[in-house]
Amino acid sequence: MIWRLPLLLVCCAVLSGCTPSGFVARQLIRAPNTFPQVVSPEPRLYFTFPDAVLDTFPLQRATVGAPAVTLAYRILPPADYRTRLTLTNHSGSTGPVPLYLFKGDIPGTPTPFTAHPRGTVVLLHGYGLSQDSMIPWALLLAEAGWRCVLVDLRGHGNSNGDRIHFGLQESADLTALIDELQRREQASWPVSVMGVSYGAAVALRWEMEEPRVRCCVAVSPYGRLGDAIEGLRAGYVSWLPAGIIRRASEKMPSLVGAGPGGLDPMEWMQFRPVGALFVAAGEDEVATPDAVRALHARAAAPSRVIEVPGARHEILPFRVEELRESVTDWLRDHGSAPPP
């Protein structure tokens, strides 16, 4: 399985040519799963997980919300999966790139938490990706006792929706999904959330709006969306004029019904601070360490920020050996209490 950081910016450049920034802005809020996979950069890493995960824990769907959206999700129950990681290299056209091989025993051996989970953790992927990218973390956290819900956010993976809202609508989607999982007796309390990049921004927004979210882990959250988009441009498609992207990012909030800065977690945190474990990558050009620390400075207690030196944006979620203890400790300490 190939992991790639889908660059809608590249698609926009190909599609727009010399078209106005307003067109580019509309493409940037378009559902990523509606774009053809014709243009993509060479992956900066590859990863695999046991194929049996997909068959043993099948994809499910729930139609929720108003207007309705059908969200695809997958549930991994607590069990001992004996998850293990081998790090090697894949030969790319420009040299070796990391290959993360996650292995495990599926369907796993029952543990005391299989019948009585610590709680539910909802895992949210990055922009343009799908729930598959969070399967390694789901295996690890399920081993530690949590029931894990993997979700394709609207416009991603196997979920529908013609546009994305950078957290404004997605938070309501997730609340409606948890309500439906309660009805199906598939959710348990307390509810925690772990998100990566775009998914981290959605996770923070959801924590602000949903009191049933008791704990959050935000991995590489951007502080300001425009800065993150510029980081993608500079890091991946530096030949694309910065002015086009800057003007497009300035127009995006109004296209989803928000005011200036309305898609920026830094602005949200100023007025509705929440606590979280913030995780930064030392060499991140999309969600820079300074941006993550600035979010932490505005966060409510309890909060903590940790940094993985030398890691880049796309690598950080797979540095599980360095992050596993901090993440599980945070969830245990702040997300395992009984609901009020």
In which residue ranges do the predicted regions lie?
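An N-terminal hydrophobic leader/cap segment in hydrolases
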Residues: 18-111
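Conserved alpha/beta-hydrolase
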Residues: 138-160
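Alpha/beta-hydrolase active-site loop
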Residues: 164-185
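Hydrolase active-site cap/lid region
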Residues: 205-258
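Short beta-strand/loop motif that positions the catalytic acidic residue
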Residues: 271-272, 278-280, 284
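Acidic catalytic loop of the alpha/beta-hydrolase fold
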Residues: 283-287, 314
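Catalytic histidine-centered segment of alpha/beta-hydrolase-like enzymes
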Residues: 311-321
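Catalytic active-site module of serine/aspartate enzymes centered on a nucleophile-bearing elbow/loop
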Residues: 319-340
